[in-house]
Curated annotation (Swiss-Prot):
Activity control note: Inhibited by the neuraminidase inhibitors zanamivir (Relenza) and oseltamivir (Tamiflu). These drugs interfere with the release of progeny virus from infected cells and are effective against all influenza strains. Resistance to neuraminidase inhibitors is quite rare.
Cellular component, GO, one term: virion membrane
Bilayer-spanning residue ranges: 12-34
InterPro entries assigned: Glyco_hydro_34, Sialidase_Influenza_A/B, Sialidase_sf
Chain positions covered by the region annotation Head of neuraminidase: 89-466
Protein name: Neuraminidase
Amino acid sequence: MLPSTIQTLTLFLTSGGVLLSLYVSASLSYLLYSDILLKFSPTKRTAPTMSLDCANVSNVQAVNRSATKEMTFLLPEPEWTYPRLSCQGSTFQKALLISPHRFGEARGNSAPLIIREPFIACGPKECKHFALTHYAAQPGGYYNGTRKDRNKLRHLISVKLGKIPTVENSIFHMAAWSGSACHDGREWTYIGVDGPDSNALIKIKYGEAYTDTYHSYANNILRTQESACNCIGGDCYLMITDGSASGISKCRFLKIREGRIIKEIFPTGRVEHTEECTCGFASNKTIECACRDNSYTAKRPFVKLNVETDTAEIRLMCTETYLDTPRPDDGSITGPCESNGDKGLGGIKGGFVHQRMASKIGRWYSRTMSKTERMGMELYVKYDGDPWTDSEALAPSGVMVSMKEPGWYSFGFEIKDKKCDVPCIGIEMVHDGGKETWHSAATAIYCLMGSGQLLWDTVTGVDMAL
């Protein structure tokens, strides 16, 4: 008896009394990736029916005039993604600039879209550059209103990372004035929020299908994180918030699987105001987020979400390096870690990404160089420790955007190499033309690579007067 791992296929073709036997043997093996067994699904292939118009031959008693054969092959399904150790490196370097409006003289399909709130998310095989467009291009006649955060024309769009977000290159995913996206290893999940301020709606798209919604719970600008959501083992976690920009705004997390919400997570702890979180995996067990408090403090609310228990807790970062803008002088806030201090009204989304190593963990952050304006962007790092209790200053690691250039929202993401993940930080560099002209953004990207010092800052190269 043949072993079960060997399949023998015998195909008999009879034509003119000639017998042909073809033997095909195939062996199956189990593949291991990150200690996770790959899953296989049976896929049937049926050979087509073929008519055999053969002449009668005297020494052939019977001729099969048709032949069919059903064969079953086992094909591997794409695997869910899990966080891995970071690729080796000790410093970030300038990786890429996407400055669409350097091509502002182009017209028609080659014209750059007017965008804001860019972010990047990566799957196993590609990264996508997302943004929220005003459904307008530059040059064009629809500049009025492109400085507004919310309107009926805004859409979540994407291009392959490295492409310029032009009319022709961009994929329009859904109507949205707030957005997120992530890849679970098998498919993309897209998140878009739009609707009136008092009754906004979260919409979820999985691949090409619109799959689920989530309604406003505080009736005050339901919104999401403006950066990538985070997936592990097929479950994707999305931060949302709903509430006043200058008062209470309590966040939640949605657990999403294949485009459908399967659980709501209600954080505990310091929950007064949490929005625009930038999140990533500290380990296979914990998602951490550095967020924005637009009402009470210049310290960042810091979330720890346990993906095994689906519980989350929020406390303020204790470091004397305050990461929001505007902010007071570093170290000037007295009292316990939960003290708000002054200059807490207003804020900005901040960059944050993990460097996972075998023996320690690095947490990289970005903040504007100006304490009062959205100008410049500097990189900081802290190895090990607990952001909730460590009061020491973060270590400065280089200037990504000088004080002469705009530094607005920033975000973190990870590029998947073959055996490790590359941590990166992206920076939104806004061309702020005021209310009378176009208002759009470039994106600067810095990634962990090599050693030494961060060498060079980024400029957009755009003159709005041209």
